Amino acid sequence: MVQLAKVPILGNDIIHVGYNIHDHLVETIIKHCPSSTYVICNDTNLSKVPYYQQLVLEFKASLPEGSRLLTYVVKPGETSKSRETKAQLEDYLLVEGCTRDTVMVAIGGGVIGDMIGFVASTFMRGVRVVQVPTSLLAMVDSSIGGKTAIDTPLGKNFIGAFWQPKFVLVDIKWLETLAKREFINGMAEVIKTACIWNADEFTRLESNASLFLNVVNGAKNVKVTNQLTNEIDEISNTDIEAMLDHTYKLVLESIKVKAEVVSSDERESSLRNLLNFGHSIGHAYEAILTPQALHGECVSIGMVKEAELSRYFGILSPTQVARLSKILVAYGLPVSPDEKWFKELTLHKKTPLDILLKKMSIDKKNEGSKKKVVILESIGKCYGDSAQFVSDEDLRFILTDETLVYPFKDIPADQQKVVIPPGSKSISNRALILAALGEGQCKIKNLLHSDDTKHMLTAVHELKGATISWEDNGETVVVEGHGGSTLSACADPLYLGNAGTASRFLTSLAALVNSTPSQKYIVLTGNARMQQRPIAPLVDSLRANGTKIEYLNNEGSLPIKVYTDSVFKGGRIELAATVSSQYVSSILMCAPYAEEPVTLALVGGKPISKLYVDMTIKMMEKFGINVETSTTEPYTYYIPKGHYINPSEYVIESDASSATYPLAFAAMTGTTVTVPNIGFESLQGDARFARDVLKPMGCKITQTATSTTVSGPPVGTLKPLKHVDMEPMTDAFLTACVVAAISHDSDPNSANTTTIEGIANQRVKECNRILAMATELAKFGVKTTELPDGIQVHGLNSIKDLKVPSDSSGPVGVCTYDDHRVAMSFSLLAGMVNSQNERDEVANPVRILERHCTGKTWPGWWDVLHSELGAKLDGAEPLECTSKKNSKKSVVIIGMRAAGKTTISKWCASALGYKLVDLDELFEQQHNNQSVKQFVVENGWEKFREEETRIFKEVIQNYGDDGYVFSTGGGIVESAESRKALKDFASSGGYVLHLHRDIEETIVFLQSDPSRPAYVEEIREVWNRREGWYKECSNFSFFAPHCSAEAEFQALRRSFSKHIATITGVREIEIPSGRSAFVCLTFDDLTEQTENLTPICYGCEAVEVRVDHLANYSADFVSKQLSILRKATDSIPIIFTVRTMKQGGNFPDEEFKTLRELYDIALKNGVEFLDLELTLPTDIQYEVINKRGNTKIIGSHHDFQGLYSWDDAEWENRFNQALTLDVDVVKFVGTAVNFEDNLRLEHFRDTHKNKPLIAVNMTSKGSISRVLNNVLTPVTSDLLPNSAAPGQLTVAQINKMYTSMGGIEPKELFVVGKPIGHSRSPILHNTGYEILGLPHKFDKFETESAQLVKEKLLDGNKNFGGAAVTIPLKLDIMQYMDELTDAAKVIGAVNTVIPLGNKKFKGDNTDWLGIRNALINNGVPEYVGHTAGLVIGAGGTSRAALYALHSLGCKKIFIINRTTSKLKPLIESLPSEFNIIGIESTKSIEEIKEHVGVAVSCVPADKPLDDELLSKLERFLVKGAHAAFVPTLLEAAYKPSVTPVMTISQDKYQWHVVPGSQMLVHQGVAQFEKWTGFKGPFKAIFDAVTKE
């Protein structure tokens, strides 16, 4: 029964804790805080809670005469905790006439409590405040102790005061409506207080974790009627009464700790900062991961890191760290920023080491630049009575998974250390199985606390095999075995990580598990490596004995499904045990529970690691079952039926494999190490390592029955071991390898070789350990030779020969392959590098990757190496963070034959500047130029697929990061191994692009192509089979329709080039910063609308595809629509929108499966923007956000019903949600009921500027909001059948309305120069103004005088908006410019004058843009780095041409001219990096090796070409034949429309030619954009300019 409890703080019983105490709450406030005015303050979310409404009504009813109750509601979220909100509340209090006797009642979470407390501390120089916390975090933390504050833009809680409340009234009932994640978030502070102060409460929390999580996870959303407004609200509801006693106690006990600490240290001078345990590091993570991560989640990670820091210092035991980590996980909190679910929640944000340390430096506990951290001594007790100083070096080590090991230089030769390794993994796992199957209680001591045993304990618990509890502050595990009778199938898969021992033992145990009415099987699974490790021999034996087992993925490996309604028969069982002795132990331990006595016969050769089998048999004997070894049959055992009887206590011997590392440290450093609890009586084979390996290598060994001491010889005098059979201790071979690496002798013929055999099983451990050692030793300069069942290590002549692992780019890390033994072995060798150098020599450390993998067997190894053995360690930013910046991930193109892979691969390579490899051609090169078709005829498809896979894996391995395009054969996806390789490459950041087109067109084409191998089956069947594989293996796709004309072909090329540039990040997707718009398409099929799509998009920065309006949602149809749109609009950015019905669209609200598929199509097609509704299920939102790649996300919310005014909390909540999701743009659409709704919207817009915001009102009353919206305003077009939303306007309508409001000022623009009578500039610009509804006017100003232009226009026309400058003023006008663009400076002329305001002007030149954009628009890639350029002529325009070709990436530009003497001064006047080569003679052209694919003619067009110049030109035109794209020549002259240069280029040499009219219009459109900020409607302008 929950009683009202009162907790004293600072000498007063003011903290009251209870359940459903609203009567007491009202009575306490009114009785003990008499006042004329009570002010209840809360946020709008709390107003929806019935319990709050009940409290307000009761408060009103209980007011004494002469008192009044005011309520003040603020918007929810951290943004309300501001100076502005505080000021608004203070103004409200003053207006309402509140005086010094006012009592503030803060009802809410930490934001409300902090802010209202601060208002109370300053209003009228301090009024009374009562805290009524409603969140768990507020109840146990922020409401207690009197800390109040607000946030500023420079940091949280920087402005505030200590102001103790009169009461803190804690009612557990508030937690019923607390959201699940907030509930779990609060548990971090609860666990923290128990951790630092109350060990008994920590133990109680441990035992109630599953109850808590079950109840909290069972929370449901319910609809309730608001008692104050009669509105229907939806709130979360948790069944608190199902865990009321636990919740009450956890809140009460946590409050007691904080109250006691605050009472001792109110102003946080010493003891109170112990409450900051987990916060020093946690706050640093929070600073980076906010708002995605919550405070408690970051503190949880911080607690684990700070506990690991204490363990690193040798203060906290590994067991205590494991307990803390386990309890946090049990309550649903993260323990590492790298947990998969937490990374997805925080949107894969990086937490760089330097940023974390920088954030940690801003901490009130610090003293100057010295950082302080709370150090834990044990669960329930801190080290010292305040935080301790910690170095950045130690923090770096704790905060990263990459470790720097410095040379073992300062370790004294006479050092003697005693090291106790953790309990044996092998014995720990066996003891847990035996105790779970046994009857009675068994106290297991020195159990290894590691990933392996954690998985085993979890499995035993989930299978209800035993009751598990802890004693001795978690050091002793108490197993209450039930004799196997309670083993029951569990519904969830048992995840075992990379725990091979647990997986093998549990496979046999699964055969003894009973079915339940709802569950007839169990699933065992693990991580990626576990799903490669073998388990087949064990499964085969169990299957043969009657247990039904299925493989769920790879044959012979986890995951497996074990059916629990089959039986473990017993009798004779044959088992192949040449790979792992764990198979044998697994069956041995479960055999007594079979239906019949078991005879276990080991077949297939000599069993591996027989000592481990002997260990199992000896342990079974301790638990009451005697195994008899056959005297007549080798390797055969008899196991009787029976039950284990648990010994009252079982002490786990230390792990002998782990003991090899400190013992080897002694050997390598010439020091002495003693392991006091492993001797010659050990059950473990690895106990022989010191005697059989280190002693013959020159070490002094002292071994008793229970201890081992190793003293190493002087450093550098270890001897190689000619031969050692390590079969009895296979896991120790890695340690032997690193010792052998620095062993040498005086025999010139020995090559310092140590030969190790008997370890073949080590190839199928956590990794292929023999290969791993060979690979990593080579990085240190140590050579090895692999043997069939072992390895030879060729030691170095001197330790000084050891190298720091590095490559051409600098130091590299030692890869540990997620293998604990690899990591620990190389931590020793790493310290020997440079250890013999002079003391003052700077020595580079060795980097070890993935240090946390040692957690499998020795989580505290690094702590022992550092604190016990004296090694200097540091942490470092992961190498991949720096190396990946420089890598150029390759592109793999897959798809059916005839999908266009060969052509598009060339385009791809050209667009990115990558190298191209056709894998079919590479195949032929590697097979003596035999064609694929011939190879298939001779060897069959299966052999070809094997070779194809091998080649693919090789090129990815060697060139996956080096900027290649790999064009594959259509059938590469037929091979499962190839599919895996493709998926692995995609998941590593590579680009796998699925190229596809209409299958019917493909079939027609393929049936008529004799050059390709014949299909055995019909093409359609092949497509049906492969289609899913293509989609599964690719992370991007491109729909490439067949092209029937060259113009279509070039349009497709431009479309693809922009697509590939977008998905690879070469082309950045920009969110417009100024006024901009997107048009909303409402067609059901774009196929028939291609002619209209360009004019529909005039004036827009993006186009929205309303997918919910499309005729069907199939992947092919939708992809085709995107392709059509890109091609027709020259790849204007696409907004991909699927609008659901409840958000005003056509898409069914609950069709989430189809919705996911559509979003997948969008992201694979690399759409620039994706509209994500904020009302969708959270899992869909996070899935899209985490897969978005370069796509920008628009978080949208629409109020079609007009339910919410713009000052309603709904919009604030949705905006905060959008911030949490970290969308790129927020889009809110309301409904204007009256004109005032637009004013409220503008206030909202004005106060929400931290994300680009599209905010508009629907209906005609809301039109003004569309005019005032300044980023990506949704618009319609007169060419659309209907608008996408009520009240939508066209771009022209918006501009005209905005002009009428004074938003756009009418400008006068001119073309200046002489003669300009025939200038097309006025019609060019005025056409654009008319179409876009702009008020400007473009006219002619004819003059030869730049002075006159300055007087009349620059100085004399107040409406001057810009000038297009033509001859003869392009040079003269420059003197009047205040700024010149780079283009104007280099080209040496100005053709565009841009007003900057205040009578200042910028001179620009857009001729080069006219050239560049005209070329790109005609199929020239945006980057042509592998092609040279050519300029014909050396006049003024040639400078713009050279500038343009350089901007396209031409590495070399040739220039020819009739008068060659003009070339040299021209070239010398331009930057040397343009690499311009002037051609003096025709002969020199023959020696040019480069392909020339792009040219610009700048010679007069009205005269015939000089013969010499013509000869040079023709020799260059020949060089276009082998360019990577259709060679293209631009004619700079506008008239005549066809020039002599164009004729000869096109007719004789098949160059594509571009008329000068296109350059004219492109440069004019560039001017248009610079002057107006709008993209010019190119097609309409071009038609107007060229219509005569």
From Swiss-Prot:
Record region (Shikimate dehydrogenase): 1306-1588
Pathway: Metabolic intermediate biosynthesis; chorismate biosynthesis; chorismate from D-erythrose 4-phosphate and phosphoenolpyruvate: step 2/7; Metabolic intermediate biosynthesis; chorismate biosynthesis; chorismate from D-erythrose 4-phosphate and phosphoenolpyruvate: step 3/7; Metabolic intermediate biosynthesis; chorismate biosynthesis; chorismate from D-erythrose 4-phosphate and phosphoenolpyruvate: step 4/7; Metabolic intermediate biosynthesis; chorismate biosynthesis; chorismate from D-erythrose 4-phosphate and phosphoenolpyruvate: step 5/7
Active-site feature positions: E268 (proton acceptor), H283 (proton acceptor), C853 (for epsp synthase activity), H1198 (proton acceptor), K1227 (schiff-base intermediate with substrate)
Catalysed conversion reaction: 7-phospho-2-dehydro-3-deoxy-D-arabino-heptonate = 3-dehydroquinate + phosphate; 3-dehydroquinate = 3-dehydroshikimate + H2O; shikimate + NADP(+) = 3-dehydroshikimate + NADPH + H(+); shikimate + ATP = 3-phosphoshikimate + ADP + H(+)
Family: In the N-terminal section; belongs to the sugar phosphate cyclases superfamily. Dehydroquinate synthase family.
Job of this protein: The AROM polypeptide catalyzes 5 consecutive enzymatic reactions in prechorismate polyaromatic amino acid biosynthesis.
Assembly and binders: Homodimer.
Alphabetized NCBIfam families for the sequence: aroA, aroB, aroD, Shik-DH-AROM
Protein name per Swiss-Prot or TrEMBL: Pentafunctional AROM polypeptide
The organism of origin for this protein: Saccharomyces cerevisiae (strain Lalvin EC1118 / Prise de mousse)
Name of encoding gene: ARO1
